[in-house]
Amino acid sequence: MKVAVIYFGGQYNHLIVKDLKYLGLEAVAITPDKSVEELKEFDSVVFGGGPYSVINELDKMGFAPDYVKSLNVPKLGICLGHQLIAKVLGGEVRKANKPEYGLTTVNIVDEDTILRGLKPSIKAWESHNDEVVRPPSGFRILASSENAKVQAMVNNDNSIFGVQFHPEVKHTEKGIEVFKNFIKICRK
């Protein structure tokens, strides 16, 4: 399976590629200046984190909004990628009332997909100023924290996922399980 990891300049994006390669996938870091057509060779897309805000810097994310809307493959958004998916598909993203940095308790409310085996909660690495406050129509919330209601979400057909936390960072408990679950979903 070939996975495009969309690189927005985030400090942890290389860890996503490393984890996916460790799990036996062909993972390639891609900058968002590639056309949608150039990404059609990939079986899935992971949108990494980065320094931008989807609130007022969507224009700095190249073709990434088009990837969200146009690529008909499973998608996983992490941190900024989670916010990007929400914003592009009609959800709401705002400046966080209380930004989260470091380890945070993430409460799993629905573990039937990407969070399988993680209930009731995990300690997860966070690094964000913005947050999804309302998922797009057709999405449900999978996890929350004390400060962020939408820590994880999925669309109704279980093909588009977002997590606010960083499963690729070693401090996140069972972070690799998030990637394993995503791979299982992609292979269905």
From Swiss-Prot:
It holds the Pfam family GATase. It comes from Sulfolobus acidocaldarius (strain ATCC 33909 / DSM 639 / JCM 8929 / NBRC 15157 / NCIMB 11770). It comes from the Archaea. This is GMP synthase [glutamine-hydrolyzing] subunit A. Residues 2-188 form the Glutamine amidotransferase type-1 domain. NCBIfam families: guaA_Nterm, PRK00758.1. Catalyzes the synthesis of GMP from XMP. Keywords: ATP-binding, Glutamine amidotransferase, GMP biosynthesis, Ligase, Nucleotide-binding, Purine biosynthesis. The active site is at residues 79, 166, 168. Its EC number is 6.3.5.2. GO terms for molecular function: ATP binding; GMP synthase activity. One of its GO terms (cellular component) is cytosol. Pathway: Purine metabolism; GMP biosynthesis; GMP from XMP (L-Gln route): step 1/1. Heterodimer composed of a glutamine amidotransferase subunit (A) and a GMP-binding subunit (B). It catalyses: XMP + L-glutamine + ATP + H2O = GMP + L-glutamate + AMP + diphosphate + 2 H(+). It is an enzyme of class 6 (ligase).
